[in-house]
Amino acid sequence: MNYKDTLLMPKTDFPMRGGLPNKEPQIQEMWDNDDQYRKALEKNKNNPSFILHDGPPYANGNLHMGHALNKIIKDFIVRYKTMQGFYAPYVPGWDTHGLPIEQALTKKGVDRKKMSVAEFREKCKEFALKQIDIQKKDFKRLGVRGDFNNPYITLTPEYEAAQIRLFGEMADKGLIYKGKKPVYWSPSSESSLAEAEIEYHDKRSASIYVAFDVKDSKGKVDSDAQFIIWTTTPWTIPSNVAITVHPELKYGQYNVDGHKYIVAQALSEEVAEALGWDKDSIQLEKEFTGKELEFVEAQHPFLDRVSLVINGEHVTTDAGTGCVHTAPGHGEDDYIVGQKYDLPVISPLNDKGVFTEEGGPFEGMFYDKANKAVTDLLKEKDALLKLDFITHSYPHDWRTKKPVIFRATPQWFASINKVKQDILDAIEDTNFKVDWGKTRIYNMIRDRGEWVISRQRVWGVPLPVFYAENGDIIMTKETVNHVADLFEKYGSNIWFEKEAKELLPEGFSHPGSPNGEFTKETDIMDVWFDSGSSHRGVLETRPELSFPADLYFEGSDQYRGWFNSSITTAVATRGQAPYKFLLSHGFVMDGEGKKMSKSLGNVIVPDQVVKQKGADIARLWVSSTDYLSDVRISDEILKKTSDVYRKIRNTLRFMLGNINDFNPETDSIAETNLLEVDRYLLNRLREFTASTINNYENFDYLNIYQEVQNFINVELSNFYLDYGKDILYIEKKDSHKRRSMQTVLYQILIDMTKLLAPILVHTAEEVWSHTPHVKEESVHLSDMPKVVDVDEELLEKWNTFMNLRDDVNRALEQARNEKVIGKSLEAKVVIGNNETFNTAEFLQQFNDLQQLFIVSQVEVKDKVKLKILIR
């Protein structure tokens, strides 16, 4: 008989190679056919719920690794909560309105001028739905489980209706109003922008110092003096109506070679240096506070207009002259201070950023091109003291990447100031994983101005506002709710298909329309109002969901985006935040921490990873990141991730192979009868389980990734599985020693598969399908292992032994390196005491020392110092 035939060798059909790109789709098809999402909900339907509300990605373009990071972590969370017994529905969503889809259609050759607005909007809808289908397929391929057959989409009639009703509630509370204010305006997209749609990039701008002659000194300054202002936007000089000084700052009238200039004393040296004044020729003639300068009149440099000197608290001595060029039509601070003095709001630009007839000599010029014309005219009028150029951080349109301007236009606003304190209080009641997350959104709300919610586009949800013949605004509870009902029945396109009168309640009348004629608002809502209404359109309308959600989790850019708009609308209408817990992740960079770009050739996309390596590799990579900050990915990083995966897979395969003849119902050994080494591993498993559960609870996936490797490498591969090979292969099939080890191996396999299931969703399912005698049809329909108390005394004893074993292994490794031995089984180890620990006495507690150390012989000597000899 062949000796090998007498061994109980491992047997399993579980393949060594994962073959994930081919195998995963088969597993996913099985899940779909079994309707596993519904089964998971049904299993926990009577249990407490956990609601993670999905922030809707934009329905345009292919998925990038940021999408993958976001959706995979959400899947970790929801799957874990489900396995912990929570009723945890996951409804994915999509954001579908806005400029990018309009631009995408234009690039495809759609000529919107050749069709009605309603027809163009239909094409936008078709495009968005196609994009959703593509992204949906890609999200599912990543192993993400959710109600993909019934997602929420911001363009659906029921969602739009909920959004309109929320708008109406805010209007009823006086939180919606129309006003002419300077707002971020994007000439490149011809629309206003919210703060969330602004990003900052470096821009080269003109830097000019301009002299304004005193026209009426009010007896406070010399009549031949000049105020000096500094600005980086020369094109706004035609809109200047005032010069703002701080009431409490000290100002000086300085004589410089016969010229008299007024600047803040704290900035006089900087101004002198900038303008090249000879310090010896500068003489301070008069001093005054900003308050004393109030109502002095200056003359506009080239227009027949007074520039009034006014007081403003926003003036600082950080830069400039302390005398601030003030154009209420082109600046928020300018507008606010201008209102106090009833100053005119001049904004002579059209939607494209081109000067109108009101711009006089600059008519027809693009604002940026007008900078030179303005400086030339200032020079001609001897008002330009200095022209230079600087590079500074400047607001840009986040979509077009082009500079934006402040421009006063009639817009619709949601009042932030009226509810700001309530929002800040709601933030205090919200839980955060990291303190800086709370600080970030708190400061953004605290410093936020009014929210401009109107957009001058067509692809979006219309503002449900009408106008009477005399211009009166009609925005009543009755009219808004009627529009909501129409949208719910027909969709928002009806707004563009019907006349205003047909959109109003039957028989509606208004004193401002004696002839019964009405017009409708042409602006649409900011897309952040769309997604920011999801707590109403989804959480409060879907029967399986509830308000507030337990968790919102998105990229860190959403502190100023979705997190921000959502809490604003929720507090305004419900008096509380829409989330109990707020969590965010960083951005995905390349292996060197650089932003990915096609030009650098460092772009990695989810589709590429899935096709080459498999979704489980992408998921394992996600678990290996410190996602709270920016994370890195590269081919090298993915290669290392694949190596870790192989180690995990091979360990699971080894355990599968060695429990093939084990039936837990009939072959298990009671814990009290297990060999001590097996009880030790069982307790280490319990420690590992408790730690892993705690890490899942705290969203600490990197800890799980590291501790899984540690448990597999240190406890299993380097010790227990190596130690147990002789027992598993050579001992009699039903021997107590073998069954004792199999009892623990089976428990390790079951628990580890469950603990890995939220991360390695496909591999865990594959392992489960090859594990004999499991009760649940899927690991994802099983429960997480329970956290139980450990035997601390036993662990302490064996931890001491394992430290000693590490010493032995180091000595064995040294002997191998010195060619004294080949394999450890060729070695005899002699162990003695050290000065503080009686090793010999301690080791008398252990049986099978040579097997535990995996050597041929162990000799324990008393009354000698610790020494490990290889013989």
Curated annotation (Swiss-Prot):
Its EC number is 6.1.1.5. One of its GO terms (molecular function) is ATP binding. A motif ('KMSKS' region) lies at residues 595-599. It catalyses: tRNA(Ile) + L-isoleucine + ATP = L-isoleucyl-tRNA(Ile) + AMP + diphosphate. A motif ('HIGH' region) lies at residues 57-67. CDD domains: Anticodon_Ia_Ile_BEm, IleRS_core. Keywords: Aminoacyl-tRNA synthetase, ATP-binding, Cytoplasm, Ligase, Nucleotide-binding, Protein biosynthesis. It is found in: Cytoplasm. L-isoleucyl-5'-AMP binds at residue 554. The keyword Phosphoprotein does not apply. The keyword ATP-binding applies. GO terms for biological process: isoleucyl-tRNA aminoacylation. ATP binds at residue 598. One of its GO terms (cellular component) is cytosol. Pfam families: Anticodon_1, tRNA-synt_1. IleRS has two distinct active sites: one for aminoacylation and one for editing. The misactivated valine is translocated from the active site to the editing site, which sterically excludes the correctly activated isoleucine. The single editing site contains two valyl binding pockets, one specific for each substrate (Val-AMP or Val-tRNA(Ile)). Monomer. Belongs to the class-I aminoacyl-tRNA synthetase family. IleS type 1 subfamily. Catalyzes the attachment of isoleucine to tRNA(Ile). As IleRS can inadvertently accommodate and process structurally similar amino acids such as valine, to avoid such errors it has two additional distinct tRNA(Ile)-dependent editing activities. One activity is designated as 'pretransfer' editing and involves the hydrolysis of activated Val-AMP. The other activity is designated 'posttransfer' editing and involves deacylation of mischarged Val-tRNA(Ile). This is Isoleucine--tRNA ligase. It comes from Staphylococcus epidermidis. The gene is ileS.
